Design a protein with these regions (language model features):
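Well-ordered alpha-helical segments within folded domains of soluble proteins
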Residues: 141-151, 162-166, 205-222, 268-285, ...
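Long, well-ordered core segments of solenoidal/helical folds
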Residues: 169-201, 231-253, 291-316, 355-380, ...
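Glycine-centered tight-turn motifs at strand-turn-strand junctions
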Residues: 468-490
């Protein structure tokens, strides 16, 4: 059942006032999406829509990554963006967009109807931009700039036009009066199953990964013969995403991202997103009786044969083939993204009996076997090689992908680490007192212990019933100590407690002992 909160067209001030309360009203057990229908918007809880955590970009605090190249197409894109952002919609920027449309129409690579529609959408977006103020103007301005930057860089090709101009029109409709979304909110528009995500300062952005994850969820509901099966909606989603596929080179199509992220200049692609798309088209081909979906998927395989920044194939840190999360970041090795890329290629190879996809999987899977052990920090997982430890959501995502590799019987190592990482989520900490048993009065004495996982550790020292020492601190996995200076001789009771901080479950362990304190000499 959908949980719905309806919003009517309201003034900007009222919309902003309502945002914090009304848009937060839906439950969190399913993905949340704001559905736009004309001048109305509603937030729904939809089991097919991924949660924010499932499709989020790297966690806050992840190190920035360098762009894959500052020459060639990457440099052209960067210069075009700087020019597009340099002034308030100059005539040269507009002329570049018009010229791109006119060239495509003259060469009959787009229809006259598309030419007129997309030109009108662009003109209307610029007019709307001029009427807006503040943050709403900034969001729409960024999306207009994205179209102009493509045109200025001679990258507004006919295959990029559908996604670019539809995204522009979505933003033009949204920003004048609809409720201001929260960061990373997902938005869809009536009549379309495609998902956009709000990135502050960058407007509503087409998000291939969350859209293709939604497609896989819709397919799963149909395969399980659930009442919620929406085969028509799945067909609409995949048909629309087919029109948004970009001919990134003569060798392959891809689904691009159109915003700046962590040093990357658009348009860039994600191996994880494209592999999920390949998987989605392969799965739906038989269900929907659409064999041409297999050809769409096959056309996307070239990204995994092509080096960055055009494609996502690189050399992993263990020396084998690795598929990148971000085409602009050739040295960022994200464990969960790599596994999902492999799963998508494996599944399509099996479904379509496709030797090329199977070969791409087999070329890179040995690298994954070498990489996964280095994701383990002993009580949790890392997000990326030599990167930060994963937050709870990314640890669970990696565990799920490991379990998926295990159930597909792709290697015992994946089963081992899926079990291990599950243990890290549910096992209590193990706390062991390490000494000393004897010390001397007035001497600074370390109360030593070993703890098995990141925990808040508390030490209390009693003389009889009297508390004489108490300390609390956070310790990582391994050994730790509290410094205690006993004032006089006697027998003291030491009580230690540990509360793990990884899972939010607050699991605990305790240890106790006695220390004999001898008189100072």
């Amino acid at each position: 059942m959908l949980v719905v909160v309806r919003m009517c067209l309201v003034s900007r001030a009222l919309a902003l006032a309502l945002t914090a309360g009304v848009l937060a009203a839906a439950p969190a057990h399913a993905g949340q999406v704001i559905v736009v229908d004309g001048n109305h918007a509603k937030r729904v809880s939809d089991a097919d829509v991924p949660t924010k955590a499932q499709v989020a970009l790297p966690p806050a605090g992840a190190p920035s990554v360098a762009s894959a190249a500052r020459t060639g197409p990457a440099a052209v894109a960067s210069r075009a963006w700087r020019r597009a952002r340099s002034s308030a919609k100059p005539r040269a920027d507009r002329r570049a967009v018009y010229n791109a449309l006119e060239r495509a129409a003259r060469s009959k690579r787009i229809s006259q109807g598309s030419y007129r529609r997309w030109r009108r959408w662009y003109v209307n977006a610029v007019r709307t931009y001029r009427r807006l103020r503040g943050a709403r103007r900034d969001q729409l301005g960024y999306v207009i700039d994205s179209v102009e930057a493509l045109a200025l860089g001679h990258m507004l090709s006919p295959t990029r036009m559908p996604a670019a101009f539809v995204q522009l029109e979505r933003n033009r409709r949204y920003w004048p009066s609809l409720p201001f979304p929260a960061a990373r909110d997902q938005i869809s528009f009536k009549g379309s199953e495609v998902l956009y995500v709000y990135f502050p300062g960058e407007g509503l952005q087409l998000h291939p990964l969350t859209t293709f994850k939604k497609a896989n969820n819709m397919h799963g509901a149909c395969e399980r013969h659930e009442g919620a099966c929406d085969a028509a909606g799945l067909r609409r989603l995949l048909d629309e995403m087919e029109t948004f596929a970009v001919r990134r080179s003569r060798r392959f199509i891809a689904w691009e991202y159109g915003f700046h992220f962590d040093g990357g200049t658009p348009p860039w692609i994600s191996g994880m997103a494209d592999a999920t798309g390949i998987q989605a088209y392969g799965r739906a081909a038989d269900l929907l009786g659409e064999p041409h979906y297999l050809e769409v998927a096959r056309e996307a395989l070239g990204a995994f044969e092509t080096l960055p920044p055009l494609g996502v194939r690189t050399t992993g840190f263990a020396g084998g083939v690795h598929y990148l999360q971000y085409s602009f970041a050739p040295r960022l090795y994200i464990f969960n993204a790599f596994l999902q890329s492999l799963i998508g290629l494996h599944d399509f190879g099996r479904i379509a009996d496709d030797e090329r996809a199977t070969k791409l999987f087999e070329e890179a899977e040995p690298e994954a076997r070498e990489e996964i052990p280095l994701s383990d920090v002993g009580d949790w997982s890392r997000y990326s090689y030599r990167g930060p430890e994963a937050n709870h959501d990314y640890h669970e995502l990696l565990r799920e992908f490991l379990a998926s590799m295990c159930t597909r019987r792709l290697g015992e190592l994946y089963c081992e680490y899926a079990d291990r990482y599950r243990g890290y989520q549910v096992d209590p900490p193990e706390l062991t007192y390490m000494g000393p048993e004897v010390t001397t009065a007035k001497r600074l004495t370390p109360i030593r212990f070993e703890v098995s996982k990141l925990s808040a550790v508390e030490a209390k020292v009693y003389r009889g019933e009297k508390l004489v020492f108490s300390r609390l601190a956070t310790f990582r996995r391994g050994t730790g100590a509290f410094a205690w200076r006993p004032r006089g001789p006697g027998v003291f009771t030491v009580r230690l407690g540990a509360k793990e901080l990884r899972t939010g479950l607050g699991k605990k362990d305790r240890a106790a002992t006695e220390i004999s304190v001898e008189p100072a000499s």
